[in-house]
């Protein structure tokens, strides 16, 4: 049903051949008039009093009912390659009348999910407060193999002010996570991304327009002094990466290799298909640079001893 909508909108290459030996266009024509489809639609209408076209609505009908698309892809000086948030999962109570989530808050930086959860549960001076911007790094492909950090979003639900806390991370979320949770920040911290230069107490500005599906995450100040986005760009460029960035100690070697190849192939936002030419060029450039420094690898003898 979704593909029928996509075809109508001209968003599919319907001439592509499928596993059936037929084109996608032919398969969709078959499905549209199939007895099974007509039977399901009839069952919904007669027994459930449900309009089949309300189960998977067209974009036009969804807009008529006030529904918006689900995903926003914020960019900014903390996510130059991009990030993603399920904007419809933000509590409507914290949106302004234009449907925009706006927050400028103090950064609370964490390297491991367990440390972030410990701060959420804390009652002491290190606890998470309303308006804080939690920044979790080292959770991308090079850090943990792109782990899912659902435990943080679940823990925030138990805070009376959890909907006033923002989470930014280079890790990922499942579809279950709710709230102002921005993931897949790229480049990830361990790939040199600016998110790895954020410090405790920095001021971060988050804007997510849930209607127009636009957003940004930016460093805009430090030490309680608010500046602007251009200041943030300059500051992030001049700062060194944090010294405590590291991959998880139990990260398997094959995962580290995969993450390295992905980083050389465009990073988190480069897609799931390796750019072999780009990877080979990067490896060759590294080999040449190593040779120029005189760091030749020792020759390997093939003689038996």
Segments (PLM) and residue ranges:
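Catalytic or ion-coupling anion/metal-binding cores of large enzyme and transporter domains
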Residues: 1-164, 168-305
């Amino acid at each position: 049903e979704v593909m029928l909508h996509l075809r109508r909108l001209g968003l599919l290459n319907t001439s592509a051949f499928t596993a059936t030996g037929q084109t996608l266009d032919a398969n969709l024509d078959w499905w549209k008039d199939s007895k099974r489809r007509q039977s399901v639609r009839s069952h919904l209408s007669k027994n459930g009093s449900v309009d089949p076209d309300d189960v998977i609505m067209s974009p036009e009908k969804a807009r008529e009912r006030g529904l918006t698309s689900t995903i926003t892809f914020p960019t900014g000086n903390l996510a130059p390659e991009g990030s993603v948030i399920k904007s419809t999962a933000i509590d409507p109570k914290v949106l302004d009348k234009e449907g925009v989530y706006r927050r400028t808050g103090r950064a609370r930086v964490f390297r491991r999910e367990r440390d972030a959860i410990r701060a959420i549960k804390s009652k002491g001076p290190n606890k998470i407060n309303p308006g804080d911007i939690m920044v979790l790094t080292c959770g991308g492909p090079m850090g943990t193999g792109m782990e899912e950090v659902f435990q943080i979003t679940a823990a925030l639900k138990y805070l009376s002010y959890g909907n006033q806390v923002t989470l930014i991370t280079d890790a990922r979320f499942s579809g279950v996570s709710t709230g102002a949770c921005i993931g897949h920040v790229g480049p990830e911290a361990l790939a040199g991304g600016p998110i790895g230069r954020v410090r405790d107490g920095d001021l971060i500005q988050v804007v997510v327009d849930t209607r127009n599906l636009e957003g940004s995450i930016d460093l805009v100040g430090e030490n309680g002094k608010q500046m602007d986005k251009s200041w943030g760009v300059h500051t992030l460029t001049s700062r060194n990466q944090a010294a405590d960035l590291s991959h998880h100690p139990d990260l398997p070697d094959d995962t580290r290799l995969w993450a390295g190849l992905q980083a050389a192939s465009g990073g988190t936002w480069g897609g799931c298909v390796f750019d072999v030419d780009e990877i080979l060029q990067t490896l060759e450039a590294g080999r040449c640079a190593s040779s120029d420094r005189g760091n030749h690898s020792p020759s390997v003898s093939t003689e038996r001893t």
